[in-house]
Regions:
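Glycine-aromatic micro-motifs
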Residues: 2-165
């Protein structure tokens, strides 16, 4: 989704780019987000947003969910012929976007991508730095990192709340 990094827990063609650094014009206008990484997990969303938004399955063509060096979370990159599976989170509020935007690592850029079954492009965070050759797998993340990552999210969210009061 997001997918949470240096500012959050650390452990393409055809896209509509939005400037990194954020609160871009894409986010306030959208109530959806294509989440392909850690933001697919209810416990992570619960810690960050205080709720789990409604979601539908989503697939972005010509994209790959890549593992990132020395990180538990992934990055979405362009790769012809591949398909990236995730969730389209729905009903996001401006307050949700503020949290998600602050949470995401600076190497992500908010862009709109085509998601199968969705008429309009859906915002997502694409990775702009080096990726591993291997794919990121949510089931591996769930087994190996979810518990600790969720605890990091809780600490990050508490600190974010103190900074934004």
């Amino acid at each position: 989704m997001t997918e949470g990094g240096a500012r959050g827990p650390a452990g393409p063609r055809g896209d509509t780019a939005a400037p990194a650094g954020r609160s871009s014009s894409l986010a306030p206008q959208a109530d959806t987000l294509f989440a392909y990484g850690t933001l697919q997990f209810g416990p992570v969303l619960e810690e960050l947003l205080g709720r789990v938004p409604e979601a539908d399955l989503g697939v972005a063509r010509d994209r790959r969910v890549a593992a990132l060096p020395k990180r538990a979370y992934p990055g979405l990159v362009a790769e012809p012929g591949r398909m990236a599976c995730g969730l389209v989170l729905q009903g996001l509020t401006p307050a949700d976007w503020e949290i998600i935007d602050a949470f995401e690592d600076e190497q992500y850029e908010l862009r709109s991508v085509r998601v199968m079954g969705w008429e309009e492009p859906v915002p997502t965070f694409v990775w702009t730095d080096v990726v591993a050759e291997r794919d990121w797998h949510p089931e591996e993340f769930a087994a190996d990192h979810l518990h600790g990552y969720t605890a990091l999210c809780a600490r990050w969210r508490a600190e974010f709340g103190r900074r934004t009061r």
